A protein has these predicted regions:
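N-terminal Rossmann-fold NAD(P) dinucleotide-binding loop
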Residues: 217
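Active-site segment of extracytoplasmic enzymes that catalyze sulfate/phosphate-ester chemistry
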Residues: 35, 245-246
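Gly/Ala-rich phosphate-binding loop of Rossmann-like dinucleotide-binding domains
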Residues: 221, 225
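Extracytoplasmic
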Residues: 36-201
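N-terminal secretory signal peptides that target proteins for export/translocation
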Residues: 1-17
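Glycine-rich FAD pyrophosphate-binding loop
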Residues: 226-245
């Protein structure tokens, strides 16, 4: 059905509201925490899918490298509020933990590690402090931990307010397993862990595809819709407006 048929008498503001709601819905759908894990399979937790992201911001800057957004502790020097979520551990035992992160100043060989943060398991921090090594995105190992079967609370605790970054968390009870760090192996593995299909679902045919919800994108999508075109509007931010938004 064409937008003109769907909204024959709607004002521009009403169209913007509907487009915004659709874009936000797509953003929410894309933020999946984890699929139901098998007892002996690695458990992948996408940070942007945390039930409560607290003061951490969802940032899609490196989606071309990782295939999904990540959480960013943008606190201007003041530690941000904790991010929290719950996952299910299918089998009790000893698990190794990894966090995909980076030391964002390491590429300039700058002193200090301003993006430091902790991972808390049921309120208890792991001994490893994350975001302290590596100029590139990588899986920083967090050691071994004994986990009981059932619900588990995860908390990301920012230590500095200076751009700590967390992409994902992995738990594995296989002592020989190491998460892949490069594509295409990593992309294939992440799709498998999350239960995503190998090929994207066909969303149909459109007269116009608009990518980006900035002022230009909004105007293009609204104008095309009002002219009767079937428009696909792609937006990876939680709000519309681009550089003119509340972000």
């Amino acid at each position: 059905m064409h937008p003109k048929e769907m909204f024959p008498n709607h004002s521009t503001q009403q169209l913007i509201n509907r487009i915004g709601a659709a874009a936000i819905s797509l953003f929410a759908i894309a933020s999946v925490v984890s699929a139901a894990p098998k007892a002996d399979a690695p458990i992948l937790v996408e940070a942007e899918g945390f039930a409560d992201t607290g003061g951490w911001a969802v940032d899609p800057q490196f989606m071309d490298l990782m295939g999904s957004p990540y959480l960013l502790a943008h606190g201007l020097g003041v530690p941000v509020k904790d991010a929290n979520t719950e996952i299910n551990i299918p089998k009790a035992g000893s698990y190794r933990v990894w966090v995909r992160t980076k030391d964002w100043v390491a590429q300039w060989k700058a002193p200090g590690t301003p993006g430091k943060f902790q991972l808390l398991i049921n309120g208890k921090p792991l001994k490893t402090t994350f975001g302290t090594v590596g100029a590139q995105w990588h899986w920083q190992e967090g050691g071994k931990i004994q986990l009981a079967k059932g619900k588990l609370k995860l908390t990301l605790h920012d230590l500095t307010g200076f751009e700590g970054r967390c992409d994902a968390i992995v738990f594995s009870n296989d002592p020989t397993f190491t998460p892949p760090n490069k594509d295409p192996e990593m992309a294939s593995w992440r799709r498998q862990c999350l239960g995503h299909p190998k090929q994207p679902e066909n969303a149909g045919e459109y007269d116009l595809v608009v990518t980006g919800g900035g002022i230009a994108g909004i105007c293009a999508a609204v104008t095309a819709s009002r002219l009767g075109l079937k428009v696909a509007f792609i937006q990876d931010r939680p709000v519309l407006g681009g550089n003119n938004s509340s972000e």
